[in-house]
Amino acid sequence: MNLLTKERGLAYVQLARIDKPIGTLLLLWPTLWALWLAAGGLPDLWTLLVFVVGVFLMRSAGCVINDYADRNFDGHVKRTAGRPLPMGKVKPREVLALFAVLALISFALVLTMNSLTIALSFAALLLAVCYPFMKRYIPIPQLVLGMAFSWSIPMAYAAQANALPLVAWLVFLANLLWTIAYDTQYAMVDRDDDLKLGLKSSAILFGRHDKRIIGVLQLATLLILLAVGQLMGLGAWYYWGLLGAAALFVYQQRLIRERQREACFQAFLNNNYAGALVFIGLVLNYLLP
């Protein structure tokens, strides 16, 4: 393999964020919550495999189309200036081709599911494509991101139970609010650059109330997940998981208190552990009732 081929391969890895799995994990945890809740324990193994692989593929596809949408802005933002497109390592048409390949493979997997899941997948694709452009038009693009990152929840219920009960939409709402909270932490890192470029974000919209609103969103997330536990008759392990997530949310508030870029980014990353704790609590609930 020559140097040019290696560089091109690395550029594709960077476009798909294979080297930065945090987004995949933040999408994966609520998907797993939904699968376990819908199945009342370990879900069907093929369904589990399809959703785990699908999460990886669609998160990568979302990152690819995001870089295409932001190709004229990323070079002016400190955090994103080194991405493949602003660096000229790949051409825009190559980025679109990679997105198409990832989306088509994902759709091929979805075709092995039932008709309700297939129907819901079209909305998932629409949300993935629309989100990157929202920061130009709406004051809180994180709302659309939250919908995109939560859409796997009704899809998981559809695939596992062929139904969309109330609890599916409660988990959807909890994850939507959580996504807005952690992506606001992420947006706090880029706030100054976004203001210069005229882009919109929840961090800009919330202004000096950002920390307080993040806290309210985190509390609402926990309360809704608490209601889910009550509706599903879940046991102590689940609530211990929620308590662990609550402790991490308090820690995140400490991290963002001075609004320093690196600390805000660390708070964002910490959400991976919060999602994992809720999932561990769910698994233990069904393993050790």
From Swiss-Prot:
Annotated keywords: Cell inner membrane, Cell membrane, Magnesium, Membrane, Transferase, Transmembrane, Transmembrane helix, Ubiquinone biosynthesis
Cofactor(s) recorded in Swiss-Prot or TrEMBL: Mg(2+)
GO annotation, cellular component aspect: plasma membrane
Main location as per UniProt: membrane
EC number of this enzyme: 2.5.1.39
Annotated compartments: Cell inner membrane
Database matches in PROSITE patterns: UBIA
Transmembrane residue ranges: 21-40, 95-115, 116-136, 138-158, 161-181, 213-233, 236-256, 268-288
An example Gene Ontology molecular-function term: 4-hydroxybenzoate polyprenyltransferase activity
One GO biological process term: ubiquinone biosynthetic process
Lipid bilayer topology: Multi-pass membrane protein
Catalytic activity: all-trans-octaprenyl diphosphate + 4-hydroxybenzoate = 4-hydroxy-3-(all-trans-octaprenyl)benzoate + diphosphate
Domain of life the protein comes from: Bacteria
InterPro entries recorded: HB_polyprenyltransferase-like (IPR006370), Prenyltransferase (IPR039653), UbiA_prenyltransferase (IPR000537), UbiA_prenylTrfase_CS (IPR030470), UbiA_sf (IPR044878)
Pathway: Cofactor biosynthesis; ubiquinone biosynthesis
Similarity comment: Belongs to the UbiA prenyltransferase family.
NCBIfam families hit by this protein: ubiA_proteo
Function, as annotated: Catalyzes the prenylation of para-hydroxybenzoate (PHB) with an all-trans polyprenyl group. Mediates the second step in the final reaction sequence of ubiquinone-8 (UQ-8) biosynthesis, which is the condensation of the polyisoprenoid side chain with PHB, generating the first membrane-bound Q intermediate 3-octaprenyl-4-hydroxybenzoate.
Entry-linked PANTHER family: 4-HYDROXYBENZOATE POLYPRENYLTRANSFERASE, MITOCHONDRIAL (PTHR11048:SF28), PRENYLTRANSFERASES (PTHR11048)
Name the UniProt record assigns to this protein: 4-hydroxybenzoate octaprenyltransferase
Organism: Aeromonas salmonicida (strain A449)
